[in-house]
Amino acid sequence: MKKKINPQAMQIADYLHDWLEHYVPSIKACSPHTKRNYKISVKLYVEFLRVIKGTTPETLSAECFCMEYIMEWIIWLKENRGCSPATCNVRLSALRVFLKYLSFRDISYMSVFLQAENVPNEKNSKRKVIGLSKQAVDVLLSMPNQGSTIGFRDYTLMLLLYSTAVRINELLTLKDRKSTR
């Protein structure tokens, strides 16, 4: 005998699929890493609902995204999965983005989104970043053989990364707007 699927569960599942497969990659223009984090965060929330709250995919509803459940999820992430406050905030942010999309697609989910927005972020202590000394930077920049083409390329790339503080992935994804290639 087939289980009766809650119509709201089907609607949420459809919106979730559309959000992950269409909205996030194209409209929101997120990186594959961000998309992967969003997917992991939602999977963890669904796992929490299944394991702790006894909610199955067939019984999913708007009530599953209430403020109380989300706050319990954050505690579950910390206690059962060993997540740091920073990781909990990333997971919470991903869930909020989905719920915002959900409320955009169907106004009846607006209260769910607003409840999620009111869940406080976890407090995390800022780690002091210890930079490299001038001598260490000089040693690093002197490593590539600037006499060769590849060495000069590497030196230029290292210098650009250092002077702009851009991440290598960000630099590699830059596109030339005027390029006709």
How would you name each of these model-derived features?
Residues 1-181:
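Conserved catalytic core of the tyrosine transesterase superfamily
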